[in-house]
Structures are given as C-alpha cells and as structure tokens.
Amino acid sequence: IFLLGPPGVAKSMVARRLKLMFRGGTAFEYLMSRFSTPDEIFGPVSIARLKNEDTYERMTEGYLPTATVVFLDEIWKAGPAIQNALLTVINEKIFRNGQFSVRVPMKGLIAASNELPASGQGLEALYDRFLVRKLVGGIEDLSDFDRMISTADESEPEMDEHLAVSDEEYRQWQEQMKSVGLHYSVLEVIHSLKDKLEDYNRQLENADSPSDVALYVSDRRWKKIVRLLRASAFLQGNTEVRLSDCLLMVHCLWNETSQIDWVRDAVLTAVGESVRGYVLNLSGIETDLQALKKEL
C-alpha cells in the first residue's frame, strides 16, 4: 500500500494498528533519507561472522526481514541498494542474507511520502509494486477533529488474541482465496477498463500539447488486482467476485494524482455498463422462459 499525503496525518499509525490483526505480530518503521543505508533497514552486518567465519551475514532481528508489518516513510528517498532488496522482498517474500535466502514473515508493506516518485530516477519498478495507492489528508469532519484534539494520547491499543489471525489461518485463507470464482461480468469490467485506458493514452498521443502522462498498467498489476478482488470477495464470505468488489480498482489504476478523477469515472462507468448488461441479459432470459412455458 502506498499512502500519499503530508506529514502528521497518522500514516504510521496505520501500520502499528495493522500489526494487531496478526497473532504475535511485530512492526518495523523507518523514515528514509538520502543517506539511509541497507544496515538501517535490513540489519547490520555481523562483524563476528565476518571475522571468524568469513561470512557476510546480517543480524536481522528487529529489522524489516523479521517484521509482520512494515512502514517505510519517505520511500522515494531510498537508494538503489535498498530499492533492489525491497523488490525481492515484495515480489518473492524472500530476503537474501549473504549466501542464504530467508523467507520473510511480512504480511503487509505500507510506504508513504508527500510526493510521487520523480521520473527518470529508476523508481518505476518499485512504484509499480505498490498495488493500492491512497491519498491521505487531515481530518475533515469537525466533530471527528474536535474529538481528536481533545482526547488524551492513548497507549498502544490491544486486541483480543482470539480475534487476531494466526499464521496457519492466514496460510489457509491464502489458499482458499484462489478458489474464489470470477463472474463473466467482472471480466467484462476489466476488458472495458483496458479499452478505456487505450483510448485515454491514444488521445494523449494525438494531443498537440499533452498536459498529462500516459496511464500504463502492467500485466503483473492486472493479475494482482484480480487477486485483490478475490480477497475482497472471500473476506465478505462470497464464493465469487462481484461487481461491487470492482470498485476497489479506483485505488489501483492511477499513477499520477491528476489521473484519479478519470480513473474513478472510468471504473464507475465500466461497472455501470456491466450492471446494465447483466440486468438486460436476465430480462432476456426471463422473456425466453416465459415463451418456453407457453410452448409447453
């Protein structure tokens, strides 16, 4: 998940609360800077192992490779060495520690920044890995704002252990999600969105002075989107992805903030078209059934 917003809007609190969902969960937080090193994220190199065993290995306990939920602030300031290691962790859930590949227990990675990644800096691959992008701002509702400023700072909240998700439950859910079906109307929505994206980019190419950048969605991203839709359906107790789940794509398809309104309209239009088509199809089936009854 990538959170885009100014400082002081409780972005890091999301990660700290999220870890409570998992039994025995731990969180790792870090504020990136241009001078951040891999040691600060993945753990320092063990001098003893390097000296006595001639082995390059990090002491990872308490750092990203051992955390359940990770929060990285100012993510785009990470250097190339950190970026490359993060790509492997996100893609494969594996951290290469010296000559060993270690499976990480990470269930969620939340990154934040008050800006989007600069173009031409080699950050495109890392940005593409963050499936959900969300704008985060200050509290707008005045009653909520008043309650926030007048309430004493709370200690770390607690969750009943019986409600927390165990590693075994999480593994089982991951397997069960794979069996969630895709209704043909959901595939129609995805096809429609792909067509709309092509039209959007084509219009930009033909514009005399394009004011926006092309909206590219990789095949890998589409596959992850479908996985998200399946997760949404599963957690609602459904055996099939529904059109309402498709609304999540509003937060998955934009790359620039200037594209958010277009993406929202495109998703709502595609879902609406599919709903109308589905209803008309049912109406046609009902007419055929009535005609068949008369013949019988």
Mark where each language-model region is:
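Walker A/P-loop
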Residues: 2-34
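Conserved RecA-like P-loop NTPase ATPase core
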Residues: 3, 12, 41, 73, ...
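Active-site phosphate-binding and catalytic loops of NTP-dependent enzymes
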Residues: 3-4, 25-28, 51-54, 94-98, ...
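Short loop/turn elements that form and flank the Walker-type P-loop nucleotide-binding site
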Residues: 9, 23-24, 64-66, 103-106
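Short glycine-rich substrate-engagement loop in P-loop NTPases that contacts/grips substrate
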Residues: 33-65
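Canonical AAA+ ATPase core
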Residues: 48-53, 69-82, 88-165, 173-174
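Conserved C-terminal "switch" segment of AAA+ ATPases
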Residues: 134-209, 238-239
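C-terminal engagement/docking regions of AAA+ P-loop ATPases
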Residues: 203-223, 231-296
